[in-house]
Amino acid sequence: MPLKFYVATRFSNKAEVRRARRLLQRTLQHEITYDWADKPLQVVTESHLKASAIKELEGVQDADYLVAILPGGFGTHVEIGAALVTDKPVFLVVPHA
């Protein structure tokens, strides 16, 4: 059974999310739990934000490990915390460091 991962970062890093997803899927045959980066941009309402947050945290819960691409937004830090609380490995990616 392949391992599952979730990628956390800020919305403006969508290209990096896609790159990480392709790399992990093609080279390791791992599966992404929730691919928020390919979701269409929607009008942001409170109900949309709540539904997105729930899906993203479920993605973290369902993952075997989390990849965090820095810098991230506030949600990235929440997702890292959720992974750590459940003893999931967290891999930090710092492009251009």
Give the location of each predicted region.
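Conserved catalytic or regulatory cores that recognize and/or transform ribose-phosphate-containing ligands
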Residues: M1-A97
